[in-house]
């Protein structure tokens, strides 16, 4: 999303505190992470398919160049602030065109795209979730999806969609041989400044440990000054606290001590491609 997020991703990937990340192609700082990823085979980077520009003053437009008639943009020509507005206005064909433009841009920049996931969960909207999966199939890249929408952490923008509504998309992903996650955990952006983090408790909860495949959608960001602190004046500390925690040897020791097997999206992509190649 920004320089601090790019810096944190590269630093923590090399430290071992995280195993994968995803880039927001429409954002102004995308060229930086594209350049870094193209020159660093260690970095496991997907595309964070983006249909919204939710910040007050740090905003972005469609990569495809589509305008008002597409329903993708607000009156100022930016992607909508709210997922609800995107769902109410965007034409599914335009959404797919924009996704493909973002993926094509990432590939052309030299990124070895390991997976596709959804900024603010918007790609999982029932208006176009089938297209989300089909785009992944077309590019031979797995998409992030859970067995139940209620187990997808960033689902607050899809509150009207039930698990029953979502079943057909899960079936579609499974039929395509996609890895389907049991749960997606997300950063707690409501944590007040000064309160201790709870990541250790989150990752060792009994229901989490009982799952086979869990995705952690965290948002570490290196401190500015004057970047993330201005972009997110109310929640910047959550991101910088993640950066500080995940960069410690204590965090690595904690992960090593748990009954967890860390994997990468590149490994899951390889398994997916091997399985689909056998079916051809």
What residue ranges belong to the model's regions?
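Structural preference for beta-strand elements that scaffold enzyme active sites
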Residues: 18-20, 42-48, 113-117, 142-144, ...
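Catalytic domains of cell-wall/extracellular-matrix polysaccharide-remodeling enzymes
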Residues: 92-93, 97-174, 179, 192-197
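Active-site gating loops and adjacent loop-to-helix segments of metal-dependent hydrolytic enzymes
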Residues: 58-88, 229-234
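C-terminal domain-boundary segment and adjacent tail
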Residues: 143, 231-280
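Active-site beta-loop-alpha junctions enriched in small/polar residues
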Residues: 24-26, 48-54, 119-121, 148-151, ...
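A short alpha/beta connector and helix-capping loop motif
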Residues: 3-27
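Acidic (Asp/Glu)-rich catalytic clusters
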Residues: 9-15, 30-44, 61-74, 107-108, ...
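A short, acidic, amphipathic alpha-helical segment used as a generic capping/interface helix at domain edges
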Residues: 195-211
């Amino acid at each position: 999303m920004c320089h601090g997020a790019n810096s944190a991703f590269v630093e923590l990937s090399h430290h071992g505190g995280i195993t994968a990340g995803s880039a927001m192609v429409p954002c102004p700082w995308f060229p930086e992470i594209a350049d870094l990823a193209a020159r660093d085979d260690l970095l496991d980077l997907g595309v964070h398919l983006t249909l919204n520009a939710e910040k007050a003053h740090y905003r972005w437009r469609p990569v495809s160049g589509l305008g008002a008639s597409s329903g993708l943009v607000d009156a100022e020509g930016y992607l909508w602030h709210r997922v609800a507005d995107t769902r109410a206005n965007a034409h599914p064909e335009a959404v797919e065109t924009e996704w493909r433009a973002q993926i094509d841009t990432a590939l052309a920049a030299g990124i070895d795209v390991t997976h596709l996931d959804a900024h603010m969960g918007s790609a999982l909207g029932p208006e176009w979730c089938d297209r989300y999966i089909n785009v992944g199939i077309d590019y031979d890249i797995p998409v992030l999806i859970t067995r139940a929408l209620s187990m997808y952490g960033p689902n607050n923008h899809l509150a009207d969609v039930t698990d029953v509504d979502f079943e057909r998309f899960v079936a579609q992903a499974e039929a395509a041989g996609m890895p389907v996650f049991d749960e997606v955990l997300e950063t707690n952006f409501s944590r007040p400044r000064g309160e201790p983090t709870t990541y250790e408790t989150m990752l060792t909860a009994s229901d989490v440990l009982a799952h086979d495949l869990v995705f952690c959608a965290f948002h570490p960001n290196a401190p500015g000054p004057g970047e993330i602190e201005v972009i997110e004046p109310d929640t910047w500390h959550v991101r910088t606290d993640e950066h500080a925690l995940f960069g410690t040897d204590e965090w690595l020791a904690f992960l090593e001590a748990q009954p967890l097997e860390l994997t990468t999206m590149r490994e899951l992509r390889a398994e997916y491609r091997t399985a689909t190649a056998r079916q051809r």
